[in-house]
Design a protein with these regions (language model features):
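RNase H-like, Mg2+-dependent phosphodiesterase core
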Residues: 1-212
Length: 212
């Protein structure tokens, strides 16, 4: 069996959670949680491909997305820009993971389990056992699966938003500040889906760099 599944098995009953979208200048942040009740033999071949979603091709993520959705208990949460601006991106990410985990726990009626959280922060105001796993999407099958659900869902969301605002190229850059995205902001200004706090920090940093 995949070493990522072995890692989960060594921790007992686990759910894994991850987010996508902390770094972009536009769009919400997505969080997902995954619980695999069992891994049937016919799924192992597909799920052996599980790894950090950023290392997989878009085609591989799409294929795994459907397998994960259909063979796990899962939840996907979107925290919108308005909420990000109110509570900051870190708190928004943790809130999304908390809500996703609580939904999975309720669906699966879990007891005596542990939550594996990708990164180096624990979920705040969370009443269940948890531990963070640095680079967990390359270590835990449940976290890797959650990473794929979050990233694919967010990419689709940004592609849909791009239909409304094609000038920013979100279907290609997913809201990250590429040169083309910055040029579009300079030409067209900000949309309602941009994150003002992120952009303020970016431009302040750029201004400081030009002083040296």
């Amino acid at each position: 069996m995949n070493e990522l599944f072995e890692f989960d098995k060594s921790n007992g009953i686990v759910i894994g959670t991850d987010e996508a979208g902390r770094g972009p200048a536009a769009g919400g942040v997505f969080a997902a949680c995954v619980y695999f009740p069992e891994i049937r033999e016919n799924l192992i071949k597909d799920l052996l491909k599980l790894n950090d979603s950023k290392k997989l091709s878009a085609k591989a993520r799409k294929s795994l997305y459907d397998v994960i959705l259909n063979n796990s208990i899962n939840a996907i949460i979107d925290i919108e820009v308005e909420e990000i601006e109110k509570i900051n991106i870190l708190n928004a990410s943790l809130k999304g993971m908390k809500l996703a985990c609580e939904e999975v726990i309720k669906k699966a009626q879990l007891e005596n389990f542990i939550t594996l959280v990708d990164g180096n922060k624990l979920i705040r105001n969370y009443t269940y056992p948890q531990k963070f796993i640095i680079k967990g999407d390359g270590k835990s099958a449940s976290i890797a699966a959650a990473s794929i659900l979050a990233k694919v869902s967010r990419d689709r969301y940004m592609t849909k938003l791009s239909e409304e605002y094609p000038q920013y190229g979100w279907n290609k850059n997913a809201g990250y500040l590429t040169a083309e995205h910055l040029k579009a902001i300079d030409t067209y200004g900000l949309s309602k889906y941009h994150r003002p706090s992120f952009l303020r920090k970016h431009f302040e940093k750029q201004k400081q760099l030009t002083l040296f």
